[in-house]
Amino acid sequence: METATLIAIFISGLLVSFTGYALYTAFGQPSQQLRDPFEEHGD
């Protein structure tokens, strides 16, 4: 394969991995530990 193709595949893989990790952190098991500033601020 050409170098440009390998670089494009590598960058695409990094982007997909980062997006998957961000979604897992936001909506998966670790989201139970996130604090909600709107619930903490009771009027």
Curated annotation (Swiss-Prot):
Pfam families: PsbN. It comes from the Eukaryota. InterPro entries: PSII_PsbN (IPR003398). One of its GO terms (cellular component) is chloroplast thylakoid membrane. It is a single-pass membrane protein. The chain crosses the membrane at residues 7-27. Keywords: Chloroplast, Membrane, Plastid, Thylakoid, Transmembrane, Transmembrane helix. It is found in: Plastid, Chloroplast thylakoid membrane. One of its GO terms (biological process) is photosynthesis. Belongs to the PsbN family. May play a role in photosystem I and II biogenesis. This is Protein PsbN. It comes from Suaeda aralocaspica. The gene is psbN.
